[in-house]
Amino acid sequence: MSSPQVKVFTFSSLLIFLTPILALIYAVLSRNFTFLNYVHVITGGTWTGIDLFMGLIMSRILRSLEPQLRAQFIMRLTPLMLLFMPSLASVAITAGVYIATWLHIFDLSNPLIIASGIIVIILSVQGFGIIMPNEVRIFLEIRRGAKNKEKINKLGMRNIYVSGSQVIFQIAIIFIMSLLTVG
């Protein structure tokens, strides 16, 4: 079975990558708080939803597939996620900081802000320190002809499990955000 030709920088993938970033830039530059809040909620909710889906649903489906099919799925998923998820995560976090600043609740002596910061650090380390490097490794393996399917499966499944574990922290930060908005 030949490996698929992987194109990361297609028009649609760049559009998917840039849309959240451009929305954030517009919201900040226009000082449109409602739109900024929308950008934060939609990117954060999408990030959480994707991680929930990956961790709870896709992990079970992928475990049940033959290794060859699992590798094929991961090889198709990775190039899309390589651009999309960092864009979503970065925009959700940045929009959240802007919102907290605009609401004058970004106070580093506030235990809820400290807890949010700790969770954001954990999520960032997982996303940018574990998941993204694994996606780059998978992508490079695909570009080399995808001969090492075992490596692709191992790294891909690790990412699926880490995505699933992120949901715990995302639910915690959603709870903290609800406390912050209520007062």
Segments predicted by a language model, with ranges:
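Polytopic transmembrane helical bundles with strong interfacial aromatic enrichment
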Residues: 1-183
